Amino acid sequence: MSNTPFLSEVSKRRTFAIISHPDAGKTTITEKVLLFGNAIQKAGTVKGRGNAQHAKSDWMEMEKERGISVTTSVMQFPYNDCLVNLLDTPGHEDFSEDTYRTLTAVDSCLMVIDAAKGVEDRTRKLMEVTRLRDTPIVTFMNKLDRDVRDPMEVLDEVENELGMMCAPITWPIGCGKEFKGVYHIHRDETILYESGHGHEIQEVRIIKGLDNPELDEKVGESLAASVREELELVMGACPEFDKELFLTGELTPVYFGTALGNFGVDHMLDGLTEWAPAPKTRQAVERDVEATEDKFSGFVFKIQANMDPKHRDRIAFMRIVSGTYTQGMKMNHVRLGKQVSISDAVTFMAGDRSRAEHAYAGDIIGLHNHGTIQIGDTFTQGESLKFSGIPNFAPELFRRIRLKDPLKQKQLLKGLVQLSEEGAVQVFRPLQNNDLIVGAVGVLQFDVVVARLKSEYNVEAIYEGVNVATARWVECGDAKKLDEFQRKNQANLALDGGDNLTYIAPTMVNLNLAKERFPDVEFRATREH
């Protein structure tokens, strides 16, 4: 293999995910990004209005019904001279650990903020996960065609709450009905906005220079004057863009626009493709693996059931870390110590699968999984590697699950264990009774589990409330102390789907007391797969 074409393929890759609070406009921005990448001709909106198409990235039945993105889909498209892999993550209240884990498979993130609301709860949580790997973040302030808060105020909020410096690249001219466009600080030009072009790419209308009298003519003298004044303040108060600080996650370039009005998305994409990193080195337990190494390696970060209602299949999403995938190649499935030949991996344009003949470091491919692949599994061309940093997160919501037909206990357990390997839910079996407790990060996960138990395992189950506030994985280097801890806390101990010891706390106070009483025991909120 001549190395130059391979290196150029890897350096072209940009793999990113979008993070946001529910309803900040993430699915809309995904659509518009695909429109600019020419992956779709006309953008759909999520809640179908009459003949508006369903958004391309929301394809599971449940999503179509509820107008939300439940599953993480992957879309690949060309933009500028790059090949972009966009991982769409559920932004709804009802999302799962999938969202967290998807963030371990990307090299950068786009944070979408509703400029009327500022930093919201879900965004904070997702940002904590990106902090684990210092992921570079590009920010898009959305919904400028509505009345929004003072942009400076929102930038301050991002700096204070998320601990990142903000470097505006574009600046809004007016907002709501008065929204006239943005001034691009780096290019010294104003790009004018015209409403009513949400479903197509707008004709670009540019005014060069901030002091150009044409600006006063087009946006009105008083608005032009106040923008010049604002910009003087912005240039003085905000840091300039610094690529090094961006790459370490300390500074974020900020763009303003409206995803629904399809304005500003291309400016953000220009910045993302220019500055966001190509596939990076990844840490394995054994060594660091460079993206540009010849030998193939990759890890599974998510398993998705029923991507094709016609086939009851499961697809394992794999991030390629190094080397090239070619159709029919042999790989080592490290956890099982088994050689497998993969000839039917797929690439994605949400919902449209096509067979992958080649894929490179940075790409996401789908492997057909018949129950042998788990989250966190590594595949290599021979070497035994285990990539680190693919966490399990302690659930925040708990229910006891009960069968309508008690004779199906075996199928229920099998179904729950498989769904937990897939990351759809976590399951806990208390040591002192035969209960099955299901833990999730978002409410919708519970609905999904019951629906899938019925359709895939023919098991009808219902939920009951359970007195559990939180769960922690328990570890202790001293076997004697661990033994004492287990003896004294039997009533609060359970095994998870992978038979790991877990402490189930009825209240946070109970957990804190246990930590005080057993200082040598570690109570972990995350656990490596």
UniProtKB/Swiss-Prot annotation:
Please name the Pfam families in this protein's record: EF-G_D2, GTP_EFTU, RF3_C
Q: Which GO terms describe its cellular component?
A: cytosol
- Residues annotated for GTP binding in this entry: 20-27, 88-92, 142-145
**Residue ranges of domain tr-type G in the record:** 11-280
Keyword Cell inner membrane carried by entry = no
Enumerate the NCBIfam families for this protein: prfC (TIGR00503), PRK00741.1 (NF001964), small_GTP (TIGR00231)
Assigned protein family: Belongs to the TRAFAC class translation factor GTPase superfamily. Classic translation factor GTPase family. PrfC subfamily.
Name of the protein in its database record:
Peptide chain release factor 3
Species the sequence originates in: Vibrio parahaemolyticus serotype O3:K6 (strain RIMD 2210633)
What is this organism's lineage?
Answer: Bacteria, Pseudomonadati, Pseudomonadota, Gammaproteobacteria, Vibrionales
